[in-house]
């Protein structure tokens, strides 16, 4: 698990998204810390007014400078039929370029609804991340 600090409340926040019948994919985001802006292992996301992800990227230059960016927490929930649909999708260029599976879904027009947590969760994506966690 690369998200060892997830708690029950974080899972519940994603589950709560599904009270809206239009939600087919849910995920968790948190405020982006300044120290993470240039870290390519931290996936950034911007959202619209309905908390639907507009774009995911490892790099800040992919976003409009005026838009607020969030840190993506790598956990998803899906409706069963959506999961079967996602399995059938073709890989996209942006997914391959950034190594982010969620770009395939965005490229194929699936909405990813985001729940915001104020918790700054530490993900383990690199050896540096692991060392940081082991020092805690």
Where are these regions (language model features)?
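Conserved core of the sugar-phosphate nucleotidyltransferase
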Residues: 6-93
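The conserved acidic donor/metal-binding loop of glycosyltransferases
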Residues: 1-4
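Conserved alpha/beta core of the MobA/IspD/sugar-nucleotide pyrophosphorylase nucleotidyltransferase superfamily
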Residues: 67-136
């Amino acid at each position: 698990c690369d998200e060892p600090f997830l708690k029950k409340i974080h899972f519940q926040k994603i589950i709560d998204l599904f009270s809206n019948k239009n939600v087919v994919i849910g995920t968790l985001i948190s405020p982006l810390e300044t120290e993470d802006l240039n870290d390519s292992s931290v996936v950034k996301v911007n959202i619209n007014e309905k908390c639907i992800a507009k774009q995911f990227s490892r790099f800040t230059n992919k976003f409009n400078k005026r838009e607020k960016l969030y840190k993506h927490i790598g956990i998803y929930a899906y409706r069963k039929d959506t999961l079967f649909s996602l399995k059938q999708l073709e890989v996209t260029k942006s997914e391959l370029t950034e190594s982010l599976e969620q770009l395939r879904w965005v490229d194929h027009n699936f909405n990813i609804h985001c729940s915001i947590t104020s918790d700054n969760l530490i993900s383990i994506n690199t050896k540096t991340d692991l060392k940081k966690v082991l020092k805690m």
